[in-house]
C-alpha cells in the first residue's frame, strides 16, 4: 500500500508546495499564455495567465517515481520505469520548446507540426526498442478476441498511438482544469490495473502522476492561476499511451480516455465537413468549445466531462480485471 500512498502524497505535496513560487516567477517576468484568436472571445481575459505549469508536475512525477522505487521497491526499478519517465520528459521537453517559442517570441503557433511530430516519433521508437528488449508480446490485445500478432507492424502502432494520444490530450487542454481532471482519472484507472496485475513499477508511476495532477489542479481549476501548457499536455498524453502499451491493454485507452478521443474526433469531423461541404458540424471545435458557445459554463463542462471520464474509467477497469 505504501507503494501507492508515497508517490500519490509525495507528488501532491511537491506540486502544491512549489507551484505558487513558479506562478510568482512567471508573473514577475510578465510571461503568460497568448490566447489563440480563433477561440471563444471571452477567453481573451485569460491572456497573460502563466503557463508551462506542466514543468513542475513533470519533475514531481519523476522524483516520486524514482524515490518510491528506490526506497520501497528497488527490485521494481525496471527498464519500463525508466522508459515511462523518458517519454514523460521527452514529450514534456517538446511541449516546453513549443511553449517557449510562444512566450519569448510572442508567436502563438509555436513549433512547426513536422518538428513536433519528429520528436514524438523518436520517443515512440525508443519506447518500441525497450518493449522488444523486454521481450514483451509483439501483439495487439483486442478485447473479446485475443492477441493480434503484428510482428514489425507493432512499431507502426506504437508510433501512431503515442503521436495520436499526445496530440489528443493537447487538443483537449482548452478549459481550466479539464485535462488535469481527466488525466488524473485515466492514470488512476491504469494504476489500479497495474497494481492488481503486480506491475508495481507502472502503478508507482501512475499514482505519482495522479498525486501531482491533483496538486496542480488546486491552481488550475477555474479561474486558473496557471496553465499546464503544451509542456504538460504533450507529456501526459505520451505517458498515458505508453502506460497502456506497457500494460498490454492498448485499446482500452479508447474507452478509458474516451473524452480525449471525442475531442479529437470533433476536430477531424469539423475540418472534414468544412472542406467537403463548406458547413460546420459544431459551433466551434474541439467539442468543449461547442458547449461553451451553447452557453455552458467552464465548470459545467468540466464536471460533465470528468463524470463521463470517471464512468468510462471505472467500467474499463472492471472489464480488464474481470478477465
From Swiss-Prot:
- Residues spanning the membrane: 3-23, 52-72, 77-97, 121-141, 145-165, 175-195, 200-220, 226-248, 301-321
EC number, as in UniProt: 2.7.8.13
User: Quick check: keyword Metal-binding in the entry?
Assistant: yes
* Source organism per UniProt: Levilactobacillus brevis (strain ATCC 367 / BCRC 12310 / CIP 105137 / JCM 1170 / LMG 11437 / NCIMB 947 / NCTC 947)
Keywords from the UniProt entry: Cell cycle, Cell division, Cell membrane, Cell shape, Cell wall biogenesis/degradation, Magnesium, Membrane, Metal-binding, Peptidoglycan synthesis, Transferase, Transmembrane, Transmembrane helix
Pathway linked to the protein: Cell wall biogenesis; peptidoglycan biosynthesis
Subcellular locations according to the entry: Cell membrane
- Provide the topology term for how it sits in the membrane: Multi-pass membrane protein
Q: Which GO terms describe its biological process?
A: cell division; cell wall organization; peptidoglycan biosynthetic process; regulation of cell shape
Q: Which InterPro entries has this protein been placed in?
A: Glycosyl_transferase_4, PNAcMuramoyl-5peptid_Trfase, PNAcMuramoyl-5peptid_Trfase_CS
**CDD domains linked to this entry:** GT_MraY (cd06852)
Q: Which reaction does it catalyse?
A: UDP-N-acetyl-alpha-D-muramoyl-L-alanyl-gamma-D-glutamyl-L-lysyl-D-alanyl-D-alanine + di-trans,octa-cis-undecaprenyl phosphate = Mur2Ac(oyl-L-Ala-gamma-D-Glu-L-Lys-D-Ala-D-Ala)-di-trans,octa-cis-undecaprenyl diphosphate + UMP
Q: Which family does it belong to?
A: Belongs to the glycosyltransferase 4 family. MraY subfamily.
Q: Return the protein name.
A: Phospho-N-acetylmuramoyl-pentapeptide-transferase
Top-level EC class as recorded in UniProt: transferase
What would you give as a GO molecular function for this chain, any one?
A: phospho-N-acetylmuramoyl-pentapeptide-transferase activity
Kindly list the cofactors needed.
Answer: Mg(2+)
Q: Which gene encodes it?
A: mraY
**Principal cellular location given in the protein's record:** membrane
**Cellular component per GO?**
plasma membrane
Instruction: Summarize the protein's role.
Output: Catalyzes the initial step of the lipid cycle reactions in the biosynthesis of the cell wall peptidoglycan: transfers peptidoglycan precursor phospho-MurNAc-pentapeptide from UDP-MurNAc-pentapeptide onto the lipid carrier undecaprenyl phosphate, yielding undecaprenyl-pyrophosphoryl-MurNAc-pentapeptide, known as lipid I.
A Pfam family cross-referenced in the UniProt record is Glycos_transf_4
